[in-house]
Amino acid sequence: EFHLEPQWADAPTAVGGVLRRRKEPDCFAVMDGGGDYIGARALGAYAPQLNAPQSLIYCVINPFRQWSDHLEHIDRTLGEILGVSHIHLEQVHILANPNTGAYTTAQEFLDGCRRVEEMISPYKPIEFACVRQQLYPQVCGDCALALLPIELYLSYDWLAVE
């Protein structure tokens, strides 16, 4: 059974039934907490479940985005998100997603991974990096991070992503 409600705007939204489903022992849920404290505020309702040992929370770092391009920005943004959501820092795992969009080059991806490592590694381990599936063969031998090839599903007409 898959529970989905389409959302057409980037707004803090919570669908019904999440708490009930999260209490099921075999529940697997993917929740997007947004890029700032406004979007993360909705996660506060789930804080007890999200802080449980079986939960895994990722903070996605894209060094090409304004809120995660410098350690100070990451610290401020993550601090605000954790403050309003009541999620414990110990629960947060870091993943790198260095991209400039659908046309990110292999070199941009590798440079972005190095930037994330330089900023984050002294403080927390980086679990893995997401790389567009088409770039994976070009970067898999040159990146120090574990890689998760991904496919883009969300696209916009003006990008003409193939």
Predicted regions and their residues:
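Active-site regions of enzymes building and remodeling cell-envelope glycoconjugates
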Residues: 124, 141-156, 162
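Residues that form generic nucleotide/phosphate-binding pockets
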Residues: 18-21, 49, 119, 153
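Conserved catalytic-core segment of NTP-binding enzymes
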Residues: 37-143
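Glycine-rich phosphate-binding loop signature in dinucleotide/nucleotide-binding domains
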Residues: 22-29, 52-53
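Switch II (G3) loop of P-loop NTPases
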Residues: 1-7, 26-42
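Residues at the C-termini of beta-strands that transition into short coil/loop
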Residues: 3, 61, 98, 151-153
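A short acidic, often aromatic-flanked loop/helix-cap motif at beta-alpha or helix-coil junctions
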Residues: 5-8, 101-103, 134-137, 153-159
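Short phosphate-binding loop-to-helix
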Residues: 5-18
